[in-house]
Amino acid sequence: MKVNTFWKLNAIAAAVIAGSTMLSTAATAAGATLEEVVVVGSRGAPRTVADSPVPVDVLSADELNSAGSNDLLMQLQGAIPSLNVHLQPISDAASMIRPANLRGLSSDSTLILVNGKRRHRASVIAFQGGGVNDGSQGPDISVIPSIALKQVEVLRDGAAAQYGSDAVAGVINFVLNDASEGGSLTVKQGEYQAGDGKTSTIAGNLGLPLTDAGFMNVSFQMRNVDPTSRSLQRPDAQALIDGGNTDVSVPAQIWGAPIVDDDVTFFFNSGLDLGNGSEAYMFGNYSERDVDGGFYYRNPNNRSGVFTYGWDSNAATRTNANGIAVNAAGQTSAEFVTGGGVVGDFVAQGTENDGTYRLVADLGGCAADVAGEIDNIRLVKTTAGENDPAGTQAILDGQRDALIASDSCYIHNEQAPGGYTPRFIGNIADTSFTAGVRGELTDGMLAGYSYDLSGSVGRNEADFGLNNTLNPSMGPDSKRDFSTGSYIQLAKTFNLDLQKQFDNTSFAAGYEWRETTFEVIAGEQASWQVGNSTIANPSDAVNGDGVAVDAYGYTEAESATAPEYNLTPAGLKAQELDEQREWSQATNIDLATFQPFNVGSHGFAGFSPDSAGAFTRRNYALYIDVESQLTDDLLVGAAVRYEDYSSFGDTANYKLTLNYQITDNVALRGSTSTGFRAPTQGQANVVNTQTTLVDGQLTQAQTLPSFKLGEGDLQPEESESYAFGLVMALGDVEITADYFNIEVTDRIALTSNAAPTAGQITSMTAAGIPNAELLGQINYFTNDFNTETEGVDIVATYGADLFGGSTDFSMAYNWTDTKVSNQGSSTSDFKVKRLEESLPNHRATFTMAQDWDGISAFVRTNYFDEYYAVHANWFGTDADSAVTVDAELTYSLTDSMSVSVGGQNIFDQDAERIDGSAGAVAEGEPGNVLGGIFYETSPMGIDGAFWYMKASYNF
């Protein structure tokens, strides 16, 4: 229904524009001027950019719209060098709501405001957020269309003492359009130079009077985006095709942008003069979109992707009484297999013991049915053709065909003969509503105070699904498409703000109450249930003599003298087939009795009823903010804020600021402050199971709350920051330069994947985690490491009459450097490198906007410094610096109508390429084994040049 509506509106808009005979102008702003008025940075009266004691950038809606993209995140990145946004081509929910980084910190370290009011965060948690954003849960900025905006104010300074949690890196305030008349309509069509990624957008804005004393301004944007692919065929998939498998997709795995369908967003902003200096206001939004992206390919002829890893990397150094290698729990590999039920690919292809294991489910009599074909029915391995790939493949094909032909055996080739690549789908719905009244009190002890009383509610829901996959544990009974559950984030806020001017001093104080709830809705049963093909602890197992045995194959008598078992899988090493056979012969237990298939929709397991629930936290805050013009040249300010949270307790923070006017054209400014970021309810309570790469192999890892692992409750991050800078107006040239330093302690992030310790297994069991001993890899949120981030921001603008018209130049430069000052015990060296080097240290933009009579042009050059590029969270390289150019040319047909053509990255600058398949991109690993062409963490994206046409009608 939404698709039909979209195209109908698109056609109507095109007709309106084509039929118009009215005159238009297309104004383009080069950047903020020092005289623009902003409300962020102080809780007192609004100030100009020049008078502000902290750095604030002001971006007009025209400047954002000239950036080419209709994605607000990309528009902001082009205008703000200290803001970085990564494409997430193969990821979890981060591909649906992309995180952005201001000043090198995580996306939830920047506070988002709309009309000066706190914006609710998204429900999505970026479990695979590209290093800096791992585990972040920030607001969904992409739902805000630039056509709904009057301007964007970017405070590049810590402001927790004024606004509360999250304002560590800074604050971005989106000011909605408040026009009471006129409007605009825009239709835009574009695609990448490679011929994919077609994007269709229609956007409109309408200003209306609300009686003769108010306004109602409404905006909408509707968008559809086709996917992109920057992929090669995976070598293993190509080998299958070369061997005659006609069911393999080309490419089997896609690296590129996801499909975005029916991306619809509506915003409204209204105000009504009540008389006596009072005004009522309301604003809000409704937004929804469908996202469909790809996951990793599952090869049908090996076990990668339908299992998790286990056993012990040090097993080769320990043996039992029989001389067989055992793990730390005293188990042989076979004993671990039968006890765990979910284990790994024991010998990977390309190793010394080259071969392929195939996981087989016994549906009843499987071993006897194909005994003549297969020596070990559960784990099929051949070494006879190690040096004869064709011979090896022939044996494997024969085994596969025998298993498929047997009614008593099952392998996943039967359902997916060409393998499968799961599709991660989601529906994101976002709503908000804010209402309030402001004015000036005229009676009582607060007479003369301006007041602002408001309440707001915001809700973000992400409904997840996984298509074209399996629940491996269900064997032949598995369906292929799953509804895996939902995340819901609900925020309620109440504010009372007071402000009064006392001669040269502005005094502000306020109260805030918030309630946030993170809710997990369970997925359908098939997405999380344990099927019959997984027997973790079979109660009816017997040995060859008919005597009952435990999960490790021991009788009750044998178990009394056996080692104390403690399943602590801690590695990804090989388990030898001869050990499996020796154990099987010694116990007379057929290994086919224990089928270690993974549980749940594979790739992103559904949320089980055990992990579902609603988790609520409340907090209140009191603040005071004072600014005083001590002399004509010196402005000083101080703010303090106290907050109390129902979860972790209270916190108090302060901020000191100054602005000193050295001359009429030169001013110094500076600030020092403390801040904090409270852990989100999602980070504190979420349970999630998904597939990730570990050393190039797919494995399932589970994210668990830290308190269920015995690691204690999450605590807030704490920060200390200071900044100082210079503001200059030299004729028509305006320059600001600022240095900043931010130290964050006890940063909240996801740990690296690791096997659970014995203590963690005990804690998980006590906390009610089912089958805790079977979890091969886990991670959790923790306060683990400290960072120090410093940098410099320089912004310069110049306007003049040049080239027969008016010309605006702007330059913005950012240097940011982050160091991990305390690594902690759970943060890997690889993650440290990503935290420190995955974002360019230097970024710059140079913009020129030219306006003639009826024609305007916009050109922006973007510079990206060297950075550490990473592929599949597996390996990385030092990427070269790069320059991209964006441009737009606009012709005014009439006073009201214009057409534009433009492009982003018009010279088609490539991202850093992964070495060719014949080369090595990591020690011992061939290149492009996953089919990627570019390192996907490129700050400029991997899709190349994008070209578009746009028609606009203003009225």
Regions found by a protein language model. Give the residues of each.
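N-terminal periplasmic "start-of-domain" segments of outer-membrane beta-barrel proteins
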Residues: 36-67, 94, 123-134, 183
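Extracytoplasmic beta-strand/coil segments of soluble accessory domains associated
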Residues: 46, 77-122
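N-terminal periplasmic accessory domains that precede
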Residues: 72-75, 79, 100, 113, ...
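A beta-strand signature from Gram-negative outer-membrane beta-barrel systems
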Residues: 119, 134-186, 229
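C-terminal beta-signal and adjacent terminal beta-strands/loops
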Residues: 122, 744-746, 863-869, 890-955
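Transmembrane beta-barrel wall of Gram-negative outer-membrane proteins
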Residues: 194-418, 422-441, 892
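Outer-membrane beta-barrel signature, preferentially recognizing the C-terminal barrel domain
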Residues: 607, 611-619, 665, 675-738, ...
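Gram-negative outer-membrane beta-barrel transporters
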Residues: 740-872, 950
